[in-house]
Amino acid sequence: MILVTGGLGMIGAHTARALLALGHDVVVTAHRRVEVPAFLEGRVTVETLDVTDRAAFLALGERHAISDIVHLAGSIPGDDPVDFFRTDLTGLVNALDAARTWGVRRFAVASSLGVYAGRPEIPWTEDLSLPTTALPHLIIAFKKAVEPLTTHSLAGSGVQPVVLRIGTIWGPLVDPASPFCPIPSLVNSASPPPDLHTGDGGDVCYAPDAGRAIALLTTAPTLQHDTYNLSSGRPFTYGEFAAVMGIDLPPGGVNSPHLDISRLTADTGFKPQFDVAASVADYKKWRETNPR
């Protein structure tokens, strides 16, 4: 059985769905969000868990034979950065403790494309040295720390770490008003968000594709690396989305960096299934009967 923490969030739920499609049993943890999406209803085991509770976390191993862990649970920063770091670091350490205690095969953990911030190269590849630079958000700062904490914590344990440098993900279950990605606002609105231009864009991946990539990295017979970029592998522009929707955007804009996924494809065979048109059609159909 594979454990997905934060398994009812957008990325976690699509990861669980993809693992089910590969024939695996899945247990997901839920804390703040407890609504089970229709595509998981009755198909996964749901455990209510505050990942900062070490005893409760380790007790999962007494109820389930867990073979692998995908750690995606995380909190949203408030006014106190130390409180945010304490919460998410405690959850990470408890997940790592569980991985070592249970002797799981593989431990996959969420990092971010934001760790590359400051590199001028396009696209971003895993072999680039991560720069020392001011970071735009507390979440990215924590994700940058997650990487060495995970690999060093699991060194010599027999548990294989898999660091997931996750790109810009959108799709079913995304926050419709996400401050990190204007795509949902563009697709959901009759008029485009202000200050959005045809040439604006960068990295993007549709959530079902992202979940499938994580599932493949979690279950692949062998992996040649411990760090993988996770996205569609191609840049996008908001002009592409606007064209699909018949919306006009003003010209201009800046196309931001995107992730190279050659390593992911080489080790798992992953290729995205959704282009811009297919993702918009799938998302709009989903939103007909779902609030997010």
Task: Show where each model-derived region lies.
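N-terminal Rossmann NAD(P)H-binding glycine-rich loop of SDR-like oxidoreductase domains
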Residues: 2-22
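NAD(P)-dependent short-chain dehydrogenase/reductase
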Residues: 148-202, 207-211
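Conserved Rossmann-fold NAD(P)-dependent oxidoreductase catalytic core, especially the SDR/UDP-sugar
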Residues: 94-138
